[in-house]
Amino acid sequence: MNRIANYVLATAFSAGALHAASLPSTNTTTTYRRVQVDGIDIFYREAGPENAPTIVLLHGFPSSSREFDTLIPLLATKYHLIAPDYPGFGLSDAPSPAAYTYTFDHLAQTMSDFLEKLKVGHYTMYLHDYGAPIGFRIILAHPDQLHALIIQNGNIYKAGLGAKWTRIAEYWADPNAHPEVLNVFLSLEATKERHVAGTSHPARYNPDTWISEYADLSRPGQREIQGDLLYDYRTNVASYSEWQAWLREHQPPTLVAWGAHDPSFVAPGAEAFRRDLPKSEIHLLDAGHFALDEKTDEIAGLIIQFMAKHPG
């Protein structure tokens, strides 16, 4: 009897393995890769035909390239998608601040070197949250490589800074005197709020998302890493006027798809792009900071329409 049971199990496992081995891999299949960049192991997602127009997806805080999991399959039939995790985020290496200086300048340099390593020299950039200051540094260093911009709650205007930034500015003035600001910034409550604040559809939000992000923030060394980056964020605000001037001069095709209920980067930050980019497309969505949480289909549709108007 045992021999019969073993035979049945072996047959089932063999059939399953054969079926798995025969499953086709298509250009729309997301692949999960790693590459060494400046001594750092960088994790990234990739999908779509390599000869298609490339969209580089730069994630926000405290997420990773995983925030694009629902968007990538909707775009991968037409575009080549690359979504890296920054050092200190997601599945990329997180060296200590003694081994890697956590500034937005340094993250941008590492991501620029990452794109060079992958031989990606012409792209549209999708910038969310932290992706905006990282992306604009890359763009200003390599303006000839940019085809178009997709901005999703990625702020470069003082008008876009929500009320919470008043307290963060106190942290910038003296981090040691305001540890409570960093405590709140890294808390589970704040991590959840970045997703659900202002939404009228809380049941559409998967709690696994912020629980996982909070687990990442609770890893050894993360307080120091994220504290350094929060302190360095002041350099982004100081750079806003430079980035705005670049937009006015170069007028890249730009799509702004902005969650209107974001308490961090409020709606006037989206509308301000029109001042410097009169031809930009601006859409305020019934969503929050992580607009992809509930507006993936709508954002994908906007991107496909936008890219069709600006081929290349």
Predicted regions and their residues:
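Bacterial N-terminal signal peptides that target proteins for export
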Residues: 1-8
